[in-house]
Amino acid sequence: MEFSENSLFSSVQENGTVTNDLWESLRSCQKPVLLYGMGNGADKIIATCERKGIDICDCFASDGFVRGQLFHGRRVLSFSEAKDKYRDSGFVALLSFGSFLPDVMDKIRQVGKECELYAPDVPVFGNTLFDMTFCRQNFDRLQSAYELMTDDISKHLFADMIRFKLTGNLRFLTVTDQTRQTIYRDLLRAEHFSSYLDLGAYNGDTVRELLTAAPSLQTAYAWEPDRRSFAKLQAYAESETRCRVIPLQRGAWSKPDTLTFDDSGNRNASILENASADIKGRIRRTTAIAVEPPDHFLRDRDVDFIKYDVEGAEHEALIGTRQTIADKAPALWVSAYHRSEDLFDLPLLLHELQPAYRLYLRRTPYIPAWDLHLIAIR
């Protein structure tokens, strides 16, 4: 399968065609393959490489970050040590962590100038890999979702995201990056918002962020299921004077239920059903959380804007808001990068729930292809 100018990729045909995926290329690669970084991302990449028959020779970290650590039984090398050890053969590096911090992204790009570097796209949640087989199987749905995009920026970004997911090439990540404030100001016109539902509010950071762009905001309902993050959210709500912040410890889902939740206390804590198989085996603490459809909460409340950043549960949360979306069509900001299916599944679902929505795809700076946002406006 070749993605050419006659397909949905016509808006970025200058970037060339994609005829195979990163995993196929790595299988036939003659250079040693090394991991760049440690943690959950590395575990997922190792598991994928094992399934694909790709050998990982070593693991390295940026110079200054190595202190004798072991990872999967190997001593972690510094980048300088890796370059010295593989001086004759060279090597392929697979980025296995992510960051939005400018200095960290600069370090990543510098490594990419000194060796052959790719950022494999492994799902944040779920077990489905966005490889060439997946792309072929879902091409019609990808095409349909692409056609729902309202502007050229969205279409260009949509195409580049597929190219990145298949190749891991960082050059596809920077063309259309925007700041969150630009999205609030120029796309959402947030200055008109008076009420807001934040699904996945973490410690209140997105309420704080929105208030900069929405001076008329009066009420923010902030849902956060994780107990540690919720404690921070409560403290923020008590201190915020610009609007009324109402914190609620609950999760968003398609129906009322009690689900098992990763009780790790980090920003990516999630419903355990959403975790990938390799991550589930390493979760040590879980708890039961109450989840409910946002529609139940919104029966007697109006909101202008809803944000969905619910760690892989976006589809279920949108289903749980279907009545509000159908009847009132508030502006939506939906995270579209947690699952491999999200790129086409979420636009198609939103169009089904509310055909009047105009759909936009935007991305804020991040390596790899995280912080991909689907914006819906009537």
Model-derived segments and spans:
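Phosphate/nucleotide-binding beta-alpha loop and adjacent structural elements of enzyme active sites
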Residues: M1-I56, S62-R378
